[in-house]
Regions:
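Disulfide-stabilized extracellular recognition modules
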Residues: 93-147
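A short alpha-helix/helix-coil micro-patch that ends at or immediately precedes a cysteine
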Residues: 21-63
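Sec-dependent N-terminal signal peptides
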Residues: 4-13
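Bacterial Sec-dependent signal peptides at the C-terminal "C-region" and cleavage site
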Residues: 12-24
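Surface-exposed patches in mature extracellular/periplasmic domains of secreted proteins
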Residues: 38-52, 65-73, 92, 116-122, ...
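Short, surface-exposed glycine/acidic/tryptophan-bearing loops
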Residues: 52-100, 119
Length: 147
């Protein structure tokens, strides 16, 4: 009986984790696209392969315990994009850490000149969004953009 209850608990937890990932991605995507619309730009579309890469990148930063565009393990994020077989001629990455909510990290990205430039780049059509939390509770956030 305990084994069956444990299996049900694991199933429910995996569903909850999956739901929360999708929810934060939707919130960030909405914030980004509202700002793009204000600037007469087409909305970005979620690319699940870019989401996967963004999550890998966020998890990598938790392992390294630092926010960086370059990883000891993967090099630059664009290596992961190429490895996944995604063709692009233009790409960018926004990263952040420490912000507790998707709304707040989006607000901070939009207030930063460089991050805002990536979000409002006319040529970008696709976005991947990821996050990971380290053992100390610090959250690392990633956005990846491609045309």
């Amino acid at each position: 009986m305990k084994r069956k209850a444990f299996i049900v608990l694991i199933f429910l937890l995996s569903f909850a984790i999956r739901f929360s990932l999708e929810e934060y991605q939707k919130i960030i995507l909405k914030g980004v696209n509202v700002e793009r619309e204000k600037n007469n730009l087409k909305p970005l579309k979620i690319d699940n392969r870019l989401n996967k890469i963004a999550i890998v990148k966020a998890k990598d930063m938790t392992r390294e315990k630092k926010m960086s565009h370059t990883s000891k393990k993967f090099g630059v994020t664009f290596n992961l994009i190429k490895k996944e077989g995604i063709f692009y001629t233009k790409a960018a990455e926004n990263i952040a850490s420490g912000h507790k909510t998707p709304e707040f990290v989006t607000e901070r990205w939009l207030k930063s000149k460089g991050h805002r430039k990536n979000i409002l780049e006319r040529d970008y059509r696709f976005i991947g969004i990821g996050k990971a939390t380290d053992n100390d509770g610090k959250i690392y956030w990633v956005q990846i953009f491609t045309n």
